[in-house]
């Protein structure tokens, strides 16, 4: 036997201290909790949903959490009078998860609750309200009118990056300065975590120089960054009265407010994303190119965004001669 092939040294790299049963149980419980809780934005929405339920229970004298199927069915029925299907479904998911996390019986598993939800679905429908898309000419006109103040430079950059990058507002405000890399063609923005990427994988979006310097997302971003006396930290930040620049990260609600301020009350922050898909599609971009920027996992959402525009653009009713 060739004993030289046999190592006489202990392999310290393959040996690790074994956790105790208590440590392993605690670790397992931690991972289970994280798996149940879901993404940060989902947890935030769920907390608000539970707070709303607690207020409703108190106002209607129906006790406190945890609840059973009967009060849950009553709550869902009440919501059906003023909420959309998607909102009701999310609230139900939050309530069910709250009970599961605390090892209470899941009231949403009850047959009566499921039948109530089926009745609500049939009554109010499930079609989500689509964020309106804007016309590119009116959008560019609105952006050009933004004054070159510190707040204006921030808002111009924020709107153009949101549109050209097809960002969700939560993704936009989560960007850091160090996540921006300028290139000869424009810029690459890196970020981690999104609605369709809940495991924190790094994703990237590209911005390109535009012929018009007033509506170029890359130049707008460069102009805004020249205001900030730092190279790390939040990209889009609060600016106080008197144009005092802070290092406080902007909230996603501010993206919605700024959108309405410059584009009009009919538009939401999500209109940038909807408009990106609609305008790119009508200008000849294929679905794979669009999905490269939006990070949609399926073409179903692309079809939803462009449905109304396609009805108008490709329709024989224009050729009736009336």
Please tell me what each predicted stretch does.
Residues 1-322:
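Extended, non-catalytic subsegments within catalytic or DNA/protein-binding/adaptor domains
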